[in-house]
Each structure stands twice: as C-alpha cells, then as structure tokens.
C-alpha cells in the first residue's frame, strides 16, 4: 500500500502519519520531501552536493530534482508500505507521482481544514514552541492554494481522492483515516495503542479531549 497525505500547513499531516505508523502500520516508511532532500544532500554525490548548495543558499529546489530524489528512495524500498507526506506540491509533481506509483495500491488522503482553524493551530504552536510560524503562515497557505486545485484535479483523473475533514480533534481524524483506508480490522488495535501510548483513561474519547499537537 502507498498512502499520500495532501493538505495545507498545520492540517495535521505529520501528526496523523506518525500515529498511523505507531498505532497501526509499524512497518510504514514515512517519506517527506524535506527529509529526503536533507538525506540526499549529505550523501556526497554530485546531485547531493547540488542540493546542499541550493539549500545552504536558500534557493528553490527544482521539481525535477525533487521527483528524482523521491523516485530513487521509492525504488530502494521495493514493495514496502510507504506514506508520502506533503507531496506533490505542483501539477508536474502530481503527474510524476502517478508514474512513480503506477500499478500500486495508491490511497490519496486530502486534508481539508478551514483557514480559521489553521490559523488557530499555527498561533498555538508558535506560542508553545517559541516559533514564528504565524508570520509566514499566510505566505505558505497562499502558495499551497495556488496549486492545490490543479493537483487534486490531476490526481483524481486516475485515482480516488479521499477527502478528510481535518477540523476535528486528532483522535477523530485518525479514526476516519483508518476507516477510509479500509483498515477496519486495525481499529481495536489502534484504540489499544492510543490508550497505552498517548492518553490516560479520562482522555480517551473519539473526537474529544485530545491534547496532542498538530504538525504540518
């Protein structure tokens, strides 16, 4: 199975990816563009050195480079379970994604969150972690919105795009994702792991009383 998480900054993609791995799919490989580029930039290859120079200078990494790095990693994993977080971010990347995972069991999850909820989360996170996320939030969201509809349109031509209302509490979103992925047999396992790993008894409730933080 290959899972793709798409959503705006602050929608909880990173949080949900980690929950899915920790509680349901322990062999899941979570791939993010930023981590893959960082890994590639330190391998000493010609491409890796080019990426390092651009990252050090704050330059934009071309789509072709991002696609190449992702494909290289995916090929190395063979038939392992994969979750791609935050990719694609352009129409070109969307078309490449379909080619990379051709004939794979591809599950695309689109996180939908209101701007108000996103802003609330970003402000809360910046206060808790002394980060200035709110200062760049509008810019990141604007960039995301410019390409999002085209990306969804491209992906939906050949695959089902599953929309998840991510305005809810963390546990409620996790439950919906598990069901939509067809992992119903994992629900009890997920509940047990949620209870054991994350919350005392009074906090276990689907859709309520979650204290975990959202990450993009």
How should these model regions be labeled?
Residues 1-216:
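Glycine-rich phosphate-binding loop of ATP-dependent small-molecule kinases
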């Amino acid at each position: 199975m290959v899972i793709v998480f798409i959503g705006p900054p602050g929608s909880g993609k990173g949080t949900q990816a980690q929950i899915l791995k920790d509680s349901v799919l322990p062999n899941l490989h979570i791939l993010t563009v930023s981590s893959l580029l960082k890994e590639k930039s330190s391998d000493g290859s010609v491409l890796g050195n080019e990426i390092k120079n651009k990252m050090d200078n704050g330059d934009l990494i071309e789509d072709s480079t991002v696609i190449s790095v992702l494909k290289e990693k995916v090929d190395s994993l063979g038939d392992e379970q994969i979750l791609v977080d935050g990719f694609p971010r352009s129409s070109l990347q969307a078309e490449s994604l379909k080619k990379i995972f051709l004939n794979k069991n591809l599950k695309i999850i689109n996180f939908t969150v209101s701007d108000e909820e996103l802003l609330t989360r970003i402000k809360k996170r910046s206060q808790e972690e002394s980060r200035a996320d709110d200062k760049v939030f509008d810019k990141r969201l604007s960039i995301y919105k410019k390409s999002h509809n085209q990306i969804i349109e491209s992906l939906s031509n050949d695959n089902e795009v599953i929309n998840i209302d991510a305005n809810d509490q963390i546990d409620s979103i996790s439950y919906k994702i598990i069901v939509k992925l067809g992992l119903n047999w994992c629900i009890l396992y997920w509940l047990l792991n949620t209870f054991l790993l994350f919350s005392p008894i009074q906090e276990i409730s689907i859709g309520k009383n979650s204290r975990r933080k959202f990450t993009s």
